[in-house]
């Protein structure tokens, strides 16, 4: 199964979102359990989590390790642990969000692989959980992740596609959090508008918005910029924007493998790369 967004564990630990240690636990055990999980040292993380079973950190890390540690995987137990944490309003919100996304995502994946899991994934309504996460913290990275997993699924269903595209646009328009969280949604939109609608203009708009915000991966910035120029050139026929982005590509990535292609396309457009 796909591993959870373990980077959040680092943020949680670094932010000091850890509970008080009980008798007999190590001084920094909650922090260390989160740190070990973030480093994907599941053996150590699980060991530390078992020392603090009554803390939010212990429950979160134990549940996640049960899901993702293949050496001692117990999906049913992990899902139950995370469900108890997610629905407990006394728990820290960040932990509930992480638990909810992991719980819903594993249930979703199990339903997609019924030949392996049968009806075990039906125990949890992943769409309901994803939407609850989105409602609990609308501008958070957890809400973004929940939406991304959910909208991909809806776009795969022909009966839901039109409504899904509307929901996608609404989510992006109304998102109240950090815009830097949105480029993955814009990339998905670019792909799906081309795949399902042959709508290159809307696809280019999403790619442009994602590029202007900035992609987390530098290689995605590079490939996205070239793709943007290519879409305006070959698919949309907008010469000014094609020229603009080809020139920007050559300025930023003059030694890349696609630089010669960008130069040739500029010459094709009568610009000569100048």
Model-derived features: positions:
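Specific register positions within alpha-helical solenoid repeats of the TPR/Sel1-like families, i.e.
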Residues: 37, 67, 104, 108-115, ...
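Alpha-helical adaptor scaffolds
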Residues: 152-156, 173-225
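Hydrophobic/aromatic packing residues within the alpha-helices of TPR/SEL1-like helical repeat arrays
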Residues: 49, 79-82, 130, 168, ...
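N-terminal leader/linker segments that initiate helical-solenoid repeat arrays
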Residues: 17-72, 76, 94-98
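Short solvent-exposed coil/turn linkers within tandem alpha-helical repeat scaffolds
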Residues: 51-58, 86-99, 132-144, 172-183, ...
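TPR/TPR-like (Sel1-like) alpha-helical repeat modules
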Residues: 83-87, 121, 125, 208, ...
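"A position-specific structural signal for the A-helix of alpha-solenoid helical repeats
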Residues: 31, 61, 65, 98, ...
